[in-house]
Each structure stands twice: as structure tokens, then as C-alpha cells.
Amino acid sequence: MGNRVNAYTSDMDFHGGSKLSKLTYPIKTIYSKEARVQLRKVLDDFKPDVCHLNNFNYQLTPSIILEIVKWRKETGRDCKIIFTAHDYQLVCPNHQLKNPITHENCEKCLGGHFMNCVKGKCVHGSTAKSIVGMMEAEFWKWNGAYKYIDKIICCSEFLKTKMDTNPLFATKTIAMHNFVEKVEPKEVEKKDYVLYFGRFSEEKGINTLVETCNLLPDIQFIFAGSGPLEDKVNQLKNGVTRGYVLSLSCVNNT
């Protein structure tokens, strides 16, 4: 016996579409009536006991939280709202706690001071996009939709500490690391190399790792994954890129 599970998602094209859609997309990234209507159909059909939210900002938007709350009141169902925080979006409009122009770590928006996002051009280095990011954060701070979230799952203790800077979240967060299947240890041939697996992007610390690789030319580094900084990784003389590793044999054969 297991639990019944259903999923709802939506894709928004931020770069294509008509001129009208490009003009209206900033509003739709903040509040989506369409997402509320479509989610209501899922709620009425599935009648969930728990709604588990992931990365809803700018796509489904936090407006779906309001629809879940409305549905709960109208049906009398005790449906819990759980949110897994994969980044810092709820406390930082560019979700990275990092300025894309200076490449410096930044916590100026913590505590709800979202105007700093515009001052630093923190969303893609653009004033216009940063204004939209600031407006989105300020609107939902004013609206108070996040107070309806029952529990916030953070993927690390560090992420939890940053989420806890908002008193509204501090009593709701829990650190729960991403789980993996348990495997029995095996005897392997010892080889001298360093393995990185994950996305090749700035927020993952790839630039720092590349600098480290250059400082340690006698050590081999193996990279498993892909991402926007893949070209920089491929230029390493002591680095080997394996793409997405489907089995350990890809690494063992290196």
C-alpha cells in the first residue's frame, strides 16, 4: 500500500512569444490567475491531504498558495502546505545571495530589504528585471501568502539559517538533506583524483574550483555533469569531463 500522488506544473516562456506577451509577462511572473484556475481543477479532482510545493516563483507564482487556502476553506479539508526550498528565493529576489555583476556574496536583502535588489541590479544584471524581482518579493511580503505554508524543508543547515532570518519562516523550517539509496561499500582500486559531480554553474562554486585546479596541476580532477560554465571546465589541462554519469563504470574506467 502506498500514497496516491499527483503532480501539477506549468511552463512559461520568458524569452519568446508575441510583443503583447512580453509586455504582460512581468505581471504574470508575480501573480498568475491562470495557475490558480488550473490548480483548482487538480484540487477538486484529486482532493489532496498534502500539497508539496517546489520552485513556484515566477512560474506558478505564490498565487497558488492562495488557491489552496481558498479550497481548504470551501471544502473543509485539512490540507497541509509543504514547501521544499531549493534556493534562497523567498529571502533573496535573485535566489543566489550573490551579485551577478560583482560576483560577491550578498545578504543585503535578508530581513525584507528588497530594494537592494534594484540597487545592485541583482537579477541578470538588469535594472528592469531587478525591479520585477523586487516587486515580486515586496508584493508577497505585503500579501502575506507565505504565512499559510505549514512547513519549509531546507536542503542544508546553511540554507535553513538564511531562511530563518525571516521570523515568519523561523518556526517552520527543517533541514533535511537530499536522500540517496543506500549501497553496500565495495573494494575499489585507489586512484589519485578529485571528483566533482553536479551542475557547472557559478552558484555551485565552479569558478573557485577551476582556480583550485589551476593551482594543483599535478592532481587530476574529474567533472560529472553539465552547465553554462562547461567550456571553462573543458579548458582545464588536468580536468576530465564525463557529462552525466549513468554508472560508476564511467569514472572507474578513467
Where are these regions (language model features)?
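N-terminal strand-loop element at the rim of the active site
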Residues: M1-F46, G227-L229
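N-terminal subdomain of nucleotide-sugar transferases
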Residues: M1-M12, D44-F46, I64-C79, E211-N214
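Short N-terminal targeting/anchoring amphipathic segment
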Residues: V42-L60, C79-T84
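Membrane-proximal helix-turn-helix segments that form the acceptor-binding/catalytic region
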Residues: K70, Q89, I101-K151
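A short beta-strand/loop micro-motif in the catalytic core of glycosyltransferases
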Residues: I82, K147-E157
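Conserved donor-binding/catalytic core segment of Leloir-type glycosyltransferases
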Residues: I153, K186-K204, L209-L216, I222
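Carbohydrate-associated surface elements
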Residues: F158, F179
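Nucleotide-activated donor-binding/catalytic signature segment of Leloir-type glycosyltransferases, i.e.
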Residues: E230-V251
